[in-house]
Design a protein with these regions (language model features):
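Condensing-enzyme catalytic core of the thiolase-fold
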Residues: 2-455, 505
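Flexible catalytic loop/linker elements that gate and position reactive groups at enzyme active sites
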Residues: 30-33, 52, 290-305, 315, ...
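A generic structural signal for nonpolar/aromatic side chains embedded in well-ordered alpha-helices
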Residues: 46-47, 76, 223, 238, ...
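A non-catalytic, amphipathic alpha-helix used as a structural packing/dimerization or gating element
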Residues: 103, 107, 477, 481, ...
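FabD-like malonyl-/acyl-CoA
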Residues: 469, 536-610
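Short, solvent-exposed alpha-helical surface patches in well-structured domains
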Residues: 42, 333, 476-477, 524, ...
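Short coil/turn segments at secondary-structure boundaries
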Residues: 57-63, 88-89, 121-123, 494-499, ...
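Short, glycine- and charge-enriched coil/turn segments that flank and shape catalytic ligand pockets
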Residues: 64-66, 118-120, 145-149, 340-347, ...
Length: 610
């Protein structure tokens, strides 16, 4: 009942009409590989600094002949690199597998780890996988070599429909495994469908998102013929200089749970999806022309399902491609639905991550979602770049909208932080999500030693930090990444890090343990392991078959109070000790801890040598 009351209280701050908690989905983990950002933390650094990751097309993406499209874009590094052995794939098969499939495998593992879920523990469970994708560039590259160059791995390796299936197969999970193609809205539609799967009980846990890799130069040329790309490599969302979009690539996944399940499991949601909607505009316009009425409708439906009023939105992450045709339509729809519902003194803030990364195609929507999740976490709104003067076709003041032009504090005096995320496919499939910050985590009462319960609120004086990898290089890399995290996050709670490493990470054959009593000592010793060295407080090696040793210490090694510190600091030890006392004799606790009235019980043979 306490959990349900907490959810009702939190929901009451969002709307007056407090309804059942059905419909809220927690984002408990994220992973991404975007231009200039190999993960959510790196993405936030890019956004907070107001930087972009647009570059000239790398040499390997230019093709044998000079392409006609502008050379700019957002690109990933080393898309050809893949740890095939880690995922149980032979080198021969890996060469035939689309890098989009390979990237989703990596992102799936990282997203589960970010959620504190050991992948082995979901085997056989109802974990659903929903992945948006529409690019087939690798298949086209393979087809150039002709059928005689194909192997038995080529067909499944290049089938886009297998992107989600391969992750489900690797994890050995039995929930739905679905590929989504609704054009540029694919990844956000995948998240929408994933939420439905959770709400119907079809899945208990879901990994959802999208992927896009632009490996074929001709694909960009064809896109330029359809709707011109920005000639100067900048996305001018809502700006008077809007002249086309910038192609980008990447992948992003989120791990979703029903909110009540996430809170009951002790998860810390990064944000909450309050509601979502998907629609199409029919044939009222040309196939690839955006439909304002359809966009208005998808906004209203999402707000209705989230059970919020439009006035409660504080920010909207735009589709925002920077095209002369698309931006005015999106702005007009937002103004009609949201801007008109807000006080004129508080225009709606809007922005687009496409100004930082380019248009990530099938992964564009999930990029916006992860941006908003990070903004909620930091309680700051990053700037939407390249905005100086409003597009003359967009009357921002009349629409009651404002472009977020700098990194600003995001606070709400009258309730949770609430944002919208939009993503529209070129064929007319529109999707909108309503996102909120999560309810505060419940705090369990502190357990006191005198009552037979551990005090989990105090960290032990020395902490073990457990690391592992499939090989020595991977182990060193883990140590380096952990060290980087501790350097970048001076506020990180070390006992939480130690716990997560010990309890919420898969354990591999190459292992190391670093023992440290503080931040500086931890940094020093992680540096040693990262460099492949050894030293005080660092133990590393390769795991072998375990062996059992039974130690009989004899009489005389006991002392009064022995184990009290362990009992006070570690709830698991306390629970086991209490269980032993119940099975043997409750007086054991008094004897070991030297409690008042216990006298010299510990010197008695009955207790000293049972």
């Amino acid at each position: 009942m306490a959990l349900q009351d907490a959810i009702r209280t939190w929901k009451g701050t969002i709307r007056v009409d407090v309804r059942a908690q059905d419909g809220n989905i927690a984002v408990v983990g994220t992973s991404c590989r975007f231009p200039g950002a190999d993960g959510p933390r790196q993405l936030w650094r890019l956004l907070a600094a107001g930087r972009h990751a647009i570059t000239e097309r790398p040499p390997g993406r230019r093709g044998p002949n000079r392409t006609v499209a502008p050379p700019w874009g957002g690109f990933l590094d080393a898309v050809d690199e893949f740890d095939a052995e880690f995922f149980g794939i032979s080198a021969r098969e890996a060469a035939s597998v689309d890098p989009q499939q390979r990237l989703v495998l990596e992102l799936g593992w990282e997203a589960l780890e970010d959620a504190g879920i050991v992948p082995d523990r979901v085997r056989g469970g109802r974990l659903g996988v929903f992945v948006g994708a529409f690019a087939d560039d690798y298949a086209h590259l393979v087809h150039r070599d002709g059928a005689t160059a194909a192997t038995r791995h080529t067909y499944p390796g290049t089938e886009r429909s297998l992107i989600a299936n391969r992750l489900s197969h690797f994890l050995d999970v039995h929930g739905p495994s679905v590929g989504i193609d609704s054009g540029q809205s694919s990844s956000l539609v995948a998240v929408h469908l994933a939420c439905q799967s959770l709400l119907t009980g079809e899945s208990d846990l879901v990994v959802a998102g999208g992927v896009q890799l632009n490996l074929l130069p001709e694909s960009v040329d064809i896109a330029d013929r359809w709707g011109p790309l920005s000639p100067d490599g900048r996305c001018y969302t809502f700006d008077s200089r809007a002249n086309g979009y910038v192609p980008g690539e990447g992948g992003g996944l989120v791990v979703l749970k029903r909110l009540e399940d996430a809170l009951a499991d002790g998860d810390t949601p990064q944000c909450v999806i309050l509601g979502s909607a998907v629609n199409h505009g029919g044939n009222g316009h040309a196939l690839t022309q955006p439909d304002e009425l359809a966009q208005q409708d998808v906004l209203r439906r999402a707000h209705e399902r989230a059970r919020i009023s439009a006035a409660q939105l504080q920010y909207v992450e735009l589709h925002g491609t920077g095209t002369p045709a698309g931006d005015p339509v999106e702005a007009s729809a937002l103004g009609a639905v949201v801007g008109s519902a807000r006080p004129r003194t508080r225009p709606l803030s809007v922005g687009s991550v496409k100004t930082n990364l380019g248009h990530l195609g099938a992964a564009a929507g999930v990029a916006g979602l992860i941006k908003v999740a990070m903004a909620i976490r930091h309680r700051e709104l990053p700037a939407s770049l390249n905005y100086e003067l409003a597009n003359p076709e967009i009357a921002l003041d009349e629409l009651n909208l404002r472009v977020q032009q700098d990194l600003g504090s995001w606070e709400s005096a009258d309730g949770p932080l609430i944002a919208g995320v939009s993503s529209f496919g070129m064929g007319g499939t529109n999707c909108h999500l309503v996102i909120s910050d999560a309810p505060p985590p419940s705090t369990a009462p502190r357990r006191e030693p005198e009552t037979g319960e551990a005090d989990s609120g105090q960290a032990p004086p020395v902490l073990p930090f457990v690391l592992s990898g499939r090989g020595s290089g991977a182990l060193c890399g883990q140590a380096a990444r952990l060290r980087s995290l501790v350097v970048e996050r001076p506020d990180v709670v070390l006992v939480d890090v130690a716990y997560s490493l010990a309890a919420d990470r898969a354990v591999h054959g190459h292992r190391a343990v670093v023992v440290a009593s503080g931040r500086e000592q931890l940094l020093d010793r992680l540096g040693v392991v990262a460099g492949g060295g050894a030293g005080a407080g660092c133990v590393s090696g390769v795991a072998g078959p375990g062996r059992v040793a039974v130690v009989f210490s004899g009489q005389g090694s006991q002392r009064v109070g022995m184990g009290r510190e362990l009992y006070r600091l570690f709830p698991v030890f306390a629970a086991a000790f209490d269980q032993v006392c119940e099975l043997l004799d409750p007086v054991v606790r008094a004897a070991v801890f030297g409690e008042e009235g216990a006298g010299g019980l510990l010197d008695s043979t009955e207790f000293a040598q049972p």
